[in-house]
């Protein structure tokens, strides 16, 4: 326990930086606004309504922040919908938005400086390819073939607001910044309760994604730090218990000598002391804990995680958030793919002299497919098709030029194919491609008050080339003379791209 506290203090004790005065600098809000534009979601997912940046309003905000009653009035009226009880809703909403964006930049500075001043001998080599989301599947394919059980974990959220502030106190000792953080959390929800309301939780997430991501990542990093430490300690249990294990073998031999030995006693004890070979993978709010251990050991880890969240973060984790399954008989939804490790039987004919016989060989393969229902539901929510997958026009885009409409539909199609190129069955992708292509044709026909057939005949091959994906272009260049190879062989060919650093917006529309 003393070692645990020592490592915990080293993890929490960092050089502190006082960054609160930066909130009174105009360049900070300009930088936050420009950074938000560069880090925005793809244009086809966002709405057309964008808030404009005004340097004049930023100067007015800084002047008001110098006033003594600026924060006092805000704290005394926490239940009001408008920031600072401003009469004009536009000004109130703009001030709260731009101030929260600037604050999100400020609280990230100590963490950025910590990496900047990291000693060179302790620097970890950075591999750009490992940033890709698809690199995770290469890891899963390499490790999961030898494992037995799987725990699908939904990381508990939301968490009590005061715990979020306490977690940041270990890294940021800038007291005014922490008070300002309490002010923002108090503004978005009721301070005296848990954020158990889905409406309050998603309000903070919608209003300021950058601040929400920072708070959530701080919470998850603290959660994983303690979890990883205890996991490393538990991996040493087989070595630490070797002495007792040998004594137990010696004692069991004595019992066997007297004729009262249980045949299954030794085997069960051996499995209990084996290293479980656990692997942990997380992205956003979902995590996977795979192991080679028994189901009994996985149940112990399940209740350990429940108690860990309860006593370390004062948060009650429902056991139903952790699902235990056998890896060979189940599939799990992760990063927009339905992954599984099925067992298949392969018949091998063996010839030995004059005799021949068949041998049944079981093989395991890491399989990834595209969830058709989920993607069609996302396209339906984005108004590209109906709930049953019937393509419809998108009226909101009829005001754009023909080239912009073709470009938007083409980029959506290419992004879907690019992200889901690791699917072993691509028929679902071809169905989505058909939906987007026909939806584009209906949108153009609606704009020009024509029929779909007439517009398709007018555009011809130009219309089809806009939906020609990168994967198809590669295969068409490699096999120009044998075009049938692509249509026959590439349905099961999986391609993992190492340049994808963001999950597709249509895959997870709730995040």
UniProtKB/Swiss-Prot annotation:
Highest taxon above the source species: Eukaryota
GO molecular function: RNA binding
Keyword RNA-binding (UniProt): yes
Cell compartments where the protein resides: Plastid, Chloroplast
GO cellular component: chloroplast
UniProt keyword list: Chloroplast, mRNA processing, Plastid, RNA-binding, tRNA processing
The UniProt record lists the keyword Plastid: yes
Cross-referenced Pfam families: Intron_maturas2, MatK_N
GO biological process: mRNA processing; RNA splicing; tRNA processing
Free-text function comment from the UniProt entry: Usually encoded in the trnK tRNA gene intron. Probably assists in splicing its own and other chloroplast group II introns.
Entry similarity comment: Belongs to the intron maturase 2 family. MatK subfamily.
The name this protein goes by in its record: Maturase K
Gene from which the chain derives: matK
């Amino acid at each position: 326990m003393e070692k645990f506290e020592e490592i915990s203090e080293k993890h929490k004790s960092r050089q502190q930086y006082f960054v609160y005065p930066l909130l009174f600098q105009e360049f900070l809000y300009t930088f936050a606004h420009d950074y938000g534009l560069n880090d925005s979601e793809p244009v086809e997912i966002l709405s057309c309504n964008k808030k404009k940046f005004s340097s004049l309003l930023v100067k007015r905000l800084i002047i008001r922040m110098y006033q003594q009653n600026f924060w006092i009035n805000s704290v005394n009226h926490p239940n009001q919908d408008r920031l600072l009880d401003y009469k004009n809703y536009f000004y109130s909403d703009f001030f709260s938005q731009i101030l929260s964006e600037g604050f999100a930049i400020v609280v990230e500075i100590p963490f950025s400086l910590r990496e900047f001043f990291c000693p060179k001998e302790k620097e970890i080599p950075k591999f750009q390819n490992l940033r890709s989301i698809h690199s995770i599947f290469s890891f899963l394919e390499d490790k999961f073939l030898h494992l037995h059980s799987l725990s699908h974990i939904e990381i508990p959220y939301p968490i009590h607001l005061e715990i979020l502030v306490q977690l940041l106190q270990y890294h940021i000792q800038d007291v005014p910044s922490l008070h300002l953080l309490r002010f923002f959390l108090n503004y978005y929800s009721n301070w005296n309760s848990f954020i158990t309301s889905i409406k309050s939780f998603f309000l903070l997430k919608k209003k300021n994604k950058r601040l929400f991501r920072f708070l959530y990542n701080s919470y998850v990093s603290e959660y994983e730090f303690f979890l990883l430490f205890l996991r490393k300690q538990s991996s040493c249990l087989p070595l630490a218990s070797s002495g007792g294990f040998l004594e137990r073998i010696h004692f069991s031999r004595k019992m066997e000598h007297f004729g009262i030995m249980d045949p299954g006693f030794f085997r069960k004890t051996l499995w209990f002391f084996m290293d479980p070979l656990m692997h942990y993978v997380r992205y956003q709010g979902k995590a996977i804990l795979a192991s080679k251990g028994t189901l009994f050991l996985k149940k112990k880890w399940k209740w350990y995680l429940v108690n860990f969240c309860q006593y370390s973060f004062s948060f009650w984790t429902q056991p139903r958030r952790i699902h235990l399954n056998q890896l060979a008989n189940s599939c799990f939804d992760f990063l927009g793919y339905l992954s599984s490790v099925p067992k298949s039987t392969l018949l091998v004919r063996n010839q030995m002299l004059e005799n021949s016989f068949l041998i049944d060989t079981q093989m395991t393969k890491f399989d990834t497919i595209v969830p058709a229902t989920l993607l069609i539901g996302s396209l339906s929510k984005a108004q590209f098709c109906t709930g049953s997958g019937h393509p419809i026009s998108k009226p909101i885009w009829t005001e754009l030029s023909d080239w912009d409409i073709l470009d938007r539909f083409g980029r959506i199609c290419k992004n879907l194919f690019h992200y889901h190129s690791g699917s072993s069955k691509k028929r679902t992708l071809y169905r989505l491609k058909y939906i987007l292509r026909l939806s584009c044709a209906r949108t153009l026909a609606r704009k020009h008050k024509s029929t779909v057939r007439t517009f398709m005949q007018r555009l011809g091959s130009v219309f089809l080339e806009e939906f020609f994906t990168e994967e198809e272009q590669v295969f068409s260049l490699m096999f120009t003379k044998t075009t049938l190879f692509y249509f026959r062989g590439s349905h099961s060919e999986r391609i993992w791209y190492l340049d994808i650093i963001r999950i597709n917006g249509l895959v997870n529309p709730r995040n």
